[in-house]
Amino acid sequence: MSVTIPQKDNQSLNKAGMGNTVRIAGVDEAGRGPLSGPVVAAAVILDPTRPITGLGDSKALSERRRRELFRLIRANAWVGIGIAEPAEIDRLNILHATMAAMRRAVARLPVRPTLVLVDGNRLPPGLPCPAEAIIKGDAKEACIGAASIIAKTVRDDLMEQAARRFPGYGFEGHKGYPSAAHKAALETSGACPIHRRSYAPVRAALESRFSTNANRCG
C-alpha cells in the first residue's frame, strides 16, 4: 500500500522568538490494535503563519470534522507518511513495526525537522534530529494532533480499499479492529492476506479451521 500526500508550497516555518528557523514535527500512528491491515504513522510540520483550529486526538473527532481537518492540514502543512504492512508486523512485532513506520514518516517529510515530538512514551531509533516522547501528546501538541488526524484518515481509507479487495470481512466498518462481526468473519472465512497472523485471535481462527478440516479428512 502506498500513499501520496500533496504538499504545501516550500517556505520557511519560523517560530516566533526562537531566532533561527525551527521546524517541529509531530508524529503519531494509527492501527496498532487491529487484527488486519497496516499500521500507519504520520509526521506533520505545521506552519505558524497558517494556524488550524481544532487539532487534537483524532479519536475524539467526528469523521466529518476529521476529514475537514485532514484537508486543511494537507493544504497548509508539510506531511510525511510511513506504513508497516501486516507481514512486517508479524515479522518484527507491532512495537518495532510501529517504530519503523514512524521513522519512515519523518524521513518522508519534504523538509528536515529540527525537533520531533512523538505521541507516547517511546522514541523511534534513528531519527535525524532531537526528539521527545509525550504521553497523550495528541491532546497536548497541535502538531501531534495533526499527525493523529492524518494517520487515522489515511489508514481508514486504506481499509476501505481493502474492503473492496476482500469482501465479506466488513473492513469498511470496523477498519480491522477486533469487533464481534470481524471475529465471526474470521471464524467463517479464515484469514485473508492482510490479516496479522501473529495476533492471537487470527492465530486461533486459523488453528480452529485447520483442526476442523483435519477432522473432516480423518
Swiss-Prot record:
Question: Which EC class is the enzyme in?
Answer: hydrolase
The residues that hold a divalent metal cation are 28-29, 119
| Gene Ontology, cellular component aspect | cytoplasm; ribonuclease H2 complex
What the entry lists under CDD domains is as follows:
RNase_HII_bacteria_HII_like
What is one process in the GO biological process aspect for this record? DNA replication, removal of RNA primer
Q: Which InterPro entries match?
A: RNase_HII, RNase_HII/HIII, RNase_HII/HIII_dom, RNaseH-like_sf, RNaseH_sf
Keywords carried by this UniProt record: Cytoplasm, Endonuclease, Hydrolase, Manganese, Metal-binding, Nuclease
List the cofactors. Mn(2+); Mg(2+)
Principal location class: cytoplasm
Q: Could you tell me the superkingdom of the organism this chain comes from? A: Bacteria
The positions making up the signal sequence are none
Which catalytic reaction applies to this protein? Answer: Endonucleolytic cleavage to 5'-phosphomonoester
Where would you find this protein in the cell?
Answer: Cytoplasm
Q: Please report the stretch or stretches of sequence annotated as the RNase H type-2 domain.
A: 22-211
Coiled-coil annotation reads: none
Q: What is its EC number?
A: 3.1.26.4
Tell me the GO molecular function terms: manganese ion binding; RNA binding; RNA-DNA hybrid ribonuclease activity
NCBIfam families assigned: PRK00015.1-3, PRK00015.1-4
Q: What is this protein's function?
A: Endonuclease that specifically degrades the RNA of RNA-DNA hybrids.
HAMAP family of this UniProt entry?
A: RNase_HII_B
Q: What is this protein called?
A: Ribonuclease HII
Organism name: Maricaulis maris (strain MCS10) (Caulobacter maris)
Q: Which gene encodes it?
A: rnhB
